[in-house]
UniProtKB/Swiss-Prot annotation:
The modification N-acetylthreonine is found at T2. InterPro entries: D1/D2, Photo_II_D1/D2_sf, Photo_RC_L/M, Photo_RC_L/M_CS, PSII_PsbD/D2. Keywords: Acetylation, Chlorophyll, Chloroplast, Chromophore, Electron transport, Iron, Magnesium, Membrane, Metal-binding, Oxidoreductase, Phosphoprotein, Photosynthesis, Photosystem II, Plastid, Thylakoid, Transmembrane, Transmembrane helix, Transport. One of its GO terms (cellular component) is photosystem II. The modification Phosphothreonine is found at T2. The gene is psbD. Belongs to the reaction center PufL/M/PsbA/D family. A plastoquinone binds at H215, F262. It comes from Fagopyrum esculentum subsp. ancestrale (Wild buckwheat). It is found in: Plastid, Chloroplast thylakoid membrane. It catalyses: 2 a plastoquinone + 4 hnu + 2 H2O = 2 a plastoquinol + O2. The D1/D2 heterodimer binds P680, chlorophylls that are the primary electron donor of PSII, and subsequent electron acceptors. It shares a non-heme iron and each subunit binds pheophytin, quinone, additional chlorophylls, carotenoids and lipids. There is also a Cl(-1) ion associated with D1 and D2, which is required for oxygen evolution. The PSII complex binds additional chlorophylls, carotenoids and specific lipids. This is Photosystem II D2 protein. The chain crosses the membrane at residues 41-61, 125-141, 153-166, 208-228, 279-295. GO terms for molecular function: chlorophyll binding; electron transporter, transferring electrons within the cyclic electron transport pathway of photosynthesis activity; iron ion binding; oxygen evolving activity.
Length: 353
């Protein structure tokens, strides 16, 4: 017995096909399936930040003024973290803390969790957008893979670190001066600058900046002369499609400068991708370690000798004293709910004092 299987016909009005056709249609601003996550989350994250920095005080959570309404400027305004007593609560507007009261929700720090979570999902949506567009135009997904670096840093600093501590209170607040305070906090309480993961992150970011500058300058230096103008901007048409720089000339130049040079564009550009992304991932891993209060380098022998010998001091021991000073001065101001009091005689003094 023979059974003939015909082509299965789909309903012309299938909802998925209708949505897929509309979402992925060629338009000035691509939407895509990733846009269903990206655009709402980005809108709420940015809107929440503008709302918080404009109107919302941090008096109830940090004892601070943090909005334009209270006299702050762009550098000092912030959306502050919730109070330490709220631990890791999601602080939902309809949750047991705010009970649907929007004013109370803002006073408790609900905007911080709102901005942090919507911001994280917005960044993930942007990475998915790059995946989706790369697949549509048949590109490899390295743009999306590269963007995983900033996502890793954001998630580790704003979400994983406070999850390892006692609450969202110890995460960075969303503001310029607030981020600076958090950097000082990281140094004082974790000796972050001596952490090898931080060192790898700095090497990655600054190394990428150096590579960018060298690459841009080299391409400009080896452009073919295809015009009569006196300089780059007059001599070359910025809209031309063909490649007009010489990899061979660039290779010869850097071979003479360093003795070695990139032999092909694939390896060169992969290296420019690898350096910053690896640096960002390493720094993110380091922050995850700090969430667990892992220590990095402790040169105890130098600390013991400095304590015993007033004439012995190294840059390391001076930095350790500086960290103790940061902790002593910052903890009392930063955690007023703990009622910490440090008498003058216990504040750290270097051997030179």
């Amino acid at each position: 017995m023979t059974i003939a299987l015909g082509k299965v016909t789909k309903d012309e009005n299938d909802l998925f096909d209708i949505m897929d056709d509309w979402l992925r249609r060629d338009r000035f601003v691509f939407v895509g399936w990733s846009g269903l996550l990206l655009f709402p989350c980005a809108y709420f994250a940015v809107g929440g930040w503008f709302t918080g920095t404009t109107f919302v005080t941090s008096w109830y959570t940090h004892g601070l003024a943090s909005s334009y309404l209270e006299g702050c400027n762009f550098l000092t305004a912030a959306v502050s973290t919730p109070a330490n007593s709220l631990a890791h609560s999601l602080l939902l507007l309809w949750g047991p803390e705010a009970q649907g009261d929007f004013t109370r929700w803002c006073q408790l720090g609900g905007l911080w969790t709102f901005v942090a979570l919507h911001g994280a999902f917005g960044l993930i949506g942007f990475m998915l957008r790059q995946f989706e567009l790369a697949r549509s135009v048949q590109l490899r997904p390295y743009n999306a893979i590269a963007f995983s670096g900033p996502i890793a840093v954001f998630v580790s600093v704003f979400l994983i670190y406070p999850l390892g501590q006692s609450g969202w209170f110890f995460a960075p607040s969303f503001g310029v001066a607030a981020i600076f305070r958090f950097i000082l906090f990281f140094q004082g309480f974790h000796n972050w600058t001596l952490n090898p993961f931080h060192m790898m992150g700095v090497a990655g970011v600054l190394g990428a900046a150096l590579l960018c500058a060298i690459h841009g300058a080299t391409v400009e230096n080896t452009l073919f002369e295809d015009g009569d103008g006196a300089n780059t901007f007059r001599a070359f048409n910025p809209t031309q499609a063909e490649e007009t720089y010489s990899m061979v000339t660039a290779n010869r130049f850097w071979s003479q400068i360093f003795g070695v040079a990139f032999s092909n564009k694939r390896w060169l550009h992969f290296f420019m991708l690898f350096v910053p992304v690896t640096g960002l991932w390493m720094s993110a891993l380091g922050v995850v370690g700090l969430a667990l209060n892992l220590r990095a380098y402790d040169f105890v022998s130098q600390e013991i000798r400095a304590a015993e010998d007033p004439e012995f001091e190294t840059f390391y021991t001076k930095n350790i004293l500086l960290n103790e000073g940061i902790r002593a001065w910052m903890a009392a101001q930063d955690q007023p709910h703990e009622n910490l009091i440090f008498p003058e005689e216990v504040l750290p003094r270097g051997n030179a004092l």
